[in-house]
Amino acid sequence: MTRRIYLKMKSLQEAVEIFLGHWDLSTMLSMEKIATTEAAGRVTAAPVFARFSVPTYHSAAMDGIALEAKRTFGAAPEKPIRLKLGVDAFWVNTGQCLPPGTNSVIMVEQLHQLDPDTVEIQAAAFPWQYVRKVGEDIVATELLLPQNHLITPAEVGAMLGAGVLEVAVKQIPRVLVIPTGDELVDVQHLEGVKAPPAGKVVEFNSWVLVHLLRQWGAICHRHEIVPDEPEQLRQAILHAVQGDYHIVVVNAGSSAGSEDHTANLIAELGEVLVHGVAIMPGKPTVLGEVNSVPVVGNPGYPVSAVISLEQFVRP
């Protein structure tokens, strides 16, 4: 069998634009609603707005007494003002709702309690002193998160605090990695610590790719090793694109070698968008689609495989 050459090599920028521009990435993943408590690490499918303000009431920011500020005007060390508890002022703890008719808090450290019913102050308080007003943190209807936003743990708290109990998120991408090659030995078939025979190598690339994809937030599965047999690889690709995978990565089989079938199969089953990218390592990358599903022919050399994955699958 003759070897092919790369006739239409693309620059990295061209390849990225062609491949990513071939699909409407905003609609590739369907929307689903999930409990906000489970939303960390997910991507919003729509803007998220606060259902109510935080806090929802005027609350004390300090332990002390709540009162109407104007009752304290004129207070000074030489002219203290006495206040009747339960009449002029009311004990409050941090976070407690202000009693009706009050708009200020004086810290307990600034009070002189004369008896169980009377306190004395020597300085005036201003309106809303040591008070967390309604909406200080979040205002009802405020935009909390934009669309296409990766939700952090802190933002889960903000949404829950603002009454958002469900959130619309994008479906988690599902990726299948298919390792290929007659020379590959599955780790499950190794005999203890005995090295594989000459001409055979332990297949590990796919596990590196699988765990990278999971680290990036995808649900990723690994196909069993497919030998250098076009019909078996054809069936593996067809089964994947007809299932529920959003991306298929074929590892190895993308170069111009006589046993590298990936590009031919993608062209036969769908369309090759790019074959060959002007990067080293990573040159043999094949980018295409089958049944409207992105299929990436990932180089077999380990460093090339990772670089290709980072450039074309991670986005």
Language-model segment annotations:
Residues 96, 181-183, 254, 302:
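Glycine-rich beta-alpha junction loops
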Residues 133-250:
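Phosphate-binding glycine-rich loops and their immediate beta-loop-alpha structural context
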Residues 100-101, 153-154, 186-187, 255-260, ...:
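Short glycine/serine/threonine-rich phosphate/pyrophosphate-binding segments
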Residues 2-167:
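Phosphate-interaction motifs
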Residues 93, 122, 146, 177-180, ...:
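Short beta-strand segments
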Residues 208, 216-315:
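Short glycine/threonine-rich loop/turn motifs
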Residues 104-112, 192, 265-272:
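A glycine- and small-aliphatic-rich helix-loop capping segment at beta-alpha/alpha-beta transitions
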